[in-house]
Amino acid sequence: SFPQGLGTGSLFVTNFSGAPLCLEGEHMWCGTPDQREFNREAAHFRHTFLNAEPSLSVQTSGSTGQPQRLSVEKQRMVRSAEATLRFLRIPNGSTALLCLPLKFIAGQMMVVRSLVGSLSLRAVCPSSRPLATLHDAPFFAAMTPMQVFESLRSPHDRRLLRRIRRLLIGGGSISPTLEEELRDFPNE
């Protein structure tokens, strides 16, 4: 990765805290190799979801029982996405954060919701602190309790977490401590 010197002939290595610019052959891209791979996974899932096949094989994470592989009709996924968008009153064109693994249905449903609601989807590699590299809070996000808990520990992440208008928390139980910390948050 190469830091940028703004055409001054010098390279500055400490003036940019964002994602690095990386060269791969004749191509330059922004972000880490892991982030680039996650973006590829998201694009591949979008392509798979939009193909002519009526159903999709999905994997549950096991948060509510044993992990399972299921065949799901795409139209059922669309109806579920429509119901969620309607219930949470998420306007078309809003920003959404994808920070859940795409190998599980929860991450895949964020992509489906973005397609159904014409949402601007920002994909961030799943991690314990998915807000760490963001500058602005998305309108809508789905996170695990652990991601929310860890985000509360960083002042930057906590500030963004408070600004997310619609936050789904799933994939595990919410501890009484986490519930208490979130009680005064303005999120829906």
Stretches with model-predicted labels:
Residues 1-37, 136:
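Structural core segment of the AMP-binding/adenylate-forming
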Residues 2-16, 84-85, 104-117:
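Hydrophobic alpha-helical segments in the ANL/AMP-binding
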Residues 41-58, 92-93:
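Conserved pre-ATP/AMP-binding loop-to-beta segment of ANL
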Residues 54-82, 89:
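Conserved AMP-binding A3 loop
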Residues 55, 93, 135-138, 161-164:
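A general structural motif
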Residues 86-91, 157-160:
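Glycine-rich helix-loop-beta junction characteristic of Rossmann-like nucleotide cofactor-binding loops
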Residues 155-188:
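Gly/Ser/Thr-rich phosphate-binding loop
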